[in-house]
């Protein structure tokens, strides 16, 4: 049987990748020029989160596979477990959101990153259900709840009113680069050691491929701590370009742990009070109706992180590059096409954009 040579296509592929690399450098350079008035902390926090999102991306694509292959959960049980975990950190975000103001950006980043490193250690070390639940998934949920709101606050403090959108766009770009790197690493390790192979780790012994992938996510979590460590805390960039040093908040207890617990307690109480007040306004229920309509679309997007790895392996076979198909392709499209789509649709209403985007996602 003869095969048609596709070697002729390689030069075109190289040109496309070369052009994409140049375009990416151009985008980041434009961000740098636009944010030249911002303190160096905006780059430190963004770079630290690139490593965090790389590790998080690797972890997300591995968890359901690992829960079934190593921990012993069925497909349905693994899916239900991940759904419950997602719900838990979503609720926790409500309580810890105000910690940034009470504790400070740097301290919250340190706490969240330490919890992420701690949890990922137990995710690859143990396969016992209760150990990975209590020492792995619980602190990981708290870590996500800590890190999610702090980024928004940090970017707001490190940019001026006229550059805040640019700051968020830069972070969104770097975040997707992190996700893409995670997909590449996920596939690369599986290609080397096999879908269900074993890897010998010095001092730790032999582990499965999926546990080794989680071990890699654990190691990638460390570099971000360096950039967080050299950040200045309690700084705020004013619109006139002056960098203000914010006064430290008065502690609510004798030590930081007591202070954090009291702040979380107050946060949940305040959130409940705000919800009661907002629920009396008709606009709130219109907004909730919009969210309910879009819930299915968003659910499919998040569901892909946990369902597609198993689906891809079963349909395409062991070793299929499922990380490249979804973990890389999706963020790369976002990085390169969001600026273009934003420019082409700059005169469209938000409602029109949401409607068309949801229809495309649902299709």
Where are these regions (language model features)?
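C-terminal ends and interior cores of transmembrane alpha-helices
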Residues: 114-128, 359-363
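Symmetry-related core transmembrane helices of the 12-TM Major Facilitator Superfamily/SLC fold
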Residues: 11-21, 207-230
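Intracellular juxtamembrane helix-capping segments at the cytosolic ends
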Residues: 146-160, 312
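Hydrophobic core of transmembrane alpha-helices in multi-pass small-molecule transporters
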Residues: 50, 119, 130-147
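Short amphipathic helix-loop junctions that connect adjacent transmembrane helices
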Residues: 59-77, 303-324
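Central cavity-lining transmembrane alpha-helices of secondary-active solute carriers
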Residues: 80-98, 180, 328-341
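Glycine-rich segments within core transmembrane alpha-helices of 12-TM secondary carriers
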Residues: 165-194, 220-221
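Helix-to-loop junctions at the C-terminal end of transmembrane segments
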Residues: 92-105, 190, 336-352
